[in-house]
Amino acid sequence: MIEIDLTSFVIITLSLAVGLTGGYYGRRFLAESRIRTAEEEVAKMLDEAAKEVEAKKKEILLEAKDEIHRNRQDAEKDIRERRRELDRVERRIIQKEEMIDKKTENMEKKEQVLLEKEKETEKTQQDLQMVLSQQLKELERLSGLSSEEAKELLLYNVSQQIRQETAVLIRNIENEAKEEADKKAKNIVSLAIQKCAADVVSESTVSVVPLPNDEMKGRIIGREGRNIRTFEALSGVDLIIDDTPEAVILSSFDPIRREVARVALGNLVSDGRIHPARIEEMVEKARKEIEQEIREVGEQAAFEVGVHGLHPELIKLLGRLKYRTSYGQNVLRHSVEVAHLAGIMAAELEVDIMLAKRSGLLHDIGKAVDHEVSGPHVEIGVDLAKKYRENKDVIHGIEAHHGDIEPETVEAVLVQAADAISASRPGARRETLETYIKRLEKLENVAESFSGVDRTFAIQAGREIRIIVKPEEIDDLHSINLARDIAAKIEQDLDYPGQIKVVVIRETRSVEYAK
């Protein structure tokens, strides 16, 4: 039993050994077989790759050969074309050279002909010179004049004739130009006058204030005339109370004073309370109202003309012109009219319309303060325009509008013409009123020339002048001497009919407030 088991064990062991050995060699055989197969496949792949590389190499070589062949053909074609172009250029050059040779030959022939003609001309000139010399000698012998003398005589006669003909021609041209210019100027001026229709209002030196009843006259006069004296002293106007029913008259050559007095008196009559303190309050209030109105009037005038950007002080001065007259003509309306006329004529001549209007509006601006500042209104206007930085052409228009200097611009000439047109219209001005006003202004200016004078008022149609002095500078004794000195200067400087009463008023006020 044990032997059987041992035999079985040996058999099994041998079987296992044989199986393992066979398995080992079988697997080794399979592995070697696979390796050989893989090596064969690799060799095959390498062979195929080598064949493909060889084929690709041949293909690339063929393409390169084809490219080289094509490039060679293109280069040969380009060379052939360039050669043909060079041949054409060469043929043209040869043709041009042949033409140049022909022209050179022709030029040489012409030059030869010219030389021959030049010789002939020189010979002819010599012959002519000889003939001329003989003729000159013969003429000198016959006329008794040398050639230089004859030349001078001939030139003198010709120059005189040309000068005479030129003078006639210039005179004719000047006459034609003047006629044409006059015709054109008349057309422009007539057109400007037709387009500009301005109102003419004759200014007066009196204003009438209506009253509710005649009893109001007594209240205006006041106790012992204190109200009327206070009113006249503060306003600087004459208050005339006569038999005119329900009305009193304010008389003054200064329209601004008269307007202030009219407004103040109207307010006093409406209020009903009339006494010195109230009169002073109302006069001051009226002055402020008139100042505001002056500003508004100036703005309205500038707006009406279409002039913008004026300095506020120039606007105020324009408004003051409403209360200023020149030979009876309202200066503000005159200035607006001049601006319109100058603008219309500038439009016709195609020059600067706004410059012409601005110069026309401001040309008489000096008249707004000429009774306060010494000197002609033109110089005052120029100084004001410079002070408020107006354009130099506007300043020139103001300076040239009365012909004090020669106008250098077309606009300045137009302002000058417009000023003359506005002033020369029938009924626009009255000489008598202006002369009267100027006499009163001179009367006030004489009094104001003394130191210590605060305000002056010429009243009673210039037969009386009231001088309000500064009490801190002029005492009572000095007031007497001042009145005498002013009267003497008036006698010396002014011509006037009759007598002028000089009244010096000195007032001292002490004001305290109870708290």
Curated annotation (Swiss-Prot):
Disulfide bonds: none
Major enzyme class: hydrolase
KH domain boundaries: 205-290
Enzyme Commission (EC) number: 3.1.-.-
Subcellular location, record wording: Cell membrane
All residue ranges annotated as the HD domain in the record: 331-424
Name this polypeptide is given: Ribonuclease Y
SMART domains: HDc, KH
General function of this protein: Endoribonuclease that initiates mRNA decay.
Gene: rny
An individual GO BP term: mRNA catabolic process
Originating species: Syntrophomonas wolfei subsp. wolfei (strain DSM 2245B / Goettingen)
Pfam families hit by this protein: HD, KH_1, RNase_Y_N
Any one GO cellular component localisation term in the record: plasma membrane
This protein's UniProt keywords: Cell membrane, Endonuclease, Hydrolase, Membrane, Nuclease, RNA-binding, Transmembrane, Transmembrane helix
Membrane-related topology note: Single-pass membrane protein
Matches recorded under InterPro entries: HD/PDEase_dom (IPR003607), HD_domain (IPR006674), HDIG_dom (IPR006675), KH_dom (IPR004087), KH_dom_type_1 (IPR004088), KH_dom_type_1_sf (IPR036612), Ribonuclease_Y (IPR017705), RNase_Y_N (IPR022711)
Transmembrane segments: 6-26
Gene Ontology MF terms: RNA binding; RNA endonuclease activity
Family stated for the protein in its record: Belongs to the RNase Y family.
Main location as per UniProt: membrane
